[in-house]
Amino acid sequence: MFAVIETGGKQYKVKPGQRLRVESLAGEVGDKIAFDKVLLVAAGEEVSVGAPYVAGGSVQATIANHGRHKKVTIIKFRRRKHSMKRQGHRQNYTEIVIDTINGKTE
């Protein structure tokens, strides 16, 4: 069984027991969260596709960790001017563990 969920403006294919990193979510480590924006639920040969979301579909997960990605360095170089500007950015993320997938399949 797997599902496709939407969170943080991105779509993720998830299975029960899977760990994945998503955009930063509010909550403490160990909190249970539910994703209601389920785009697809599949169990074996049975598939339910939402328009845009599956009615009654939800995915429960547990927050495992909060962290920050590796640093990305941005360089703005001005040719012939002997100048450049450097800037770094680290994006926050939340690591979650998928517990259950709920949703009826056709």
UniProtKB/Swiss-Prot annotation:
Keyword field: Ribonucleoprotein, Ribosomal protein, RNA-binding, rRNA-binding
Superkingdom per UniProt: Bacteria
GO biological process: translation
Disulfide-bond pairs as recorded: none
Keyword Ribonucleoprotein set for record: yes
Cellular component per GO, a single term: ribonucleoprotein complex
HAMAP family named among the record's database cross-references: Ribosomal_bL21
Subunit structure: Part of the 50S ribosomal subunit. Contacts protein L20.
The name this protein goes by in its record: Large ribosomal subunit protein bL21
Gene: rplU
